[in-house]
Regions:
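HIT superfamily nucleotide-processing domains
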Residues: 1-107
Length: 107
């Protein structure tokens, strides 16, 4: 994701803030599936929380903005932290999922 933030890899950016970038997932798990990433590299959500509560709050606020911009009546925000939780890209990120009924538990 560092290369996307740097503009070296194309992405469909839907929103941004000073500290975060939001772009569409290339393998969406829902009709709306957007990733919100911090602009600086932090490997996972726990690392982001430890490094900067303000940057974590910024990412969560941008996720809410994305949901509003997309007109989602309901949405889910997911952060997989660690390989055992399904994290496959080790740059902290939030998944914003919506556009259909989401069941629980997710998987």
């Amino acid at each position: 994701f560092c290369r996307i933030v740097a503009g070296q890899i194309p992405a469909t950016v839907v929103a941004e803030s000073v500290n975060s970038l939001a772009f569409r997932d290339i393998e969406p798990g829902a009709p709306t599936h957007v990733l919100v990433v911090p602009r600086r590299h932090v490997p996972d959500l726990a690392g982001l929380a430890a490094a900067s509560a303000a940057e974590l709050a910024d990412a969560v606020a941008l996720a809410a903005q994305v949901a509003d911009d997309e007109g989602l009546p309901g949405y889910r925000v997911v952060a997989n932290t660690g390989e055992a939780a399904g994290q496959s890209v080790f740059h902290a990120h939030l998944h914003v999922l919506g556009g259909r009924s989401l069941t629980w538990p997710p998987g």
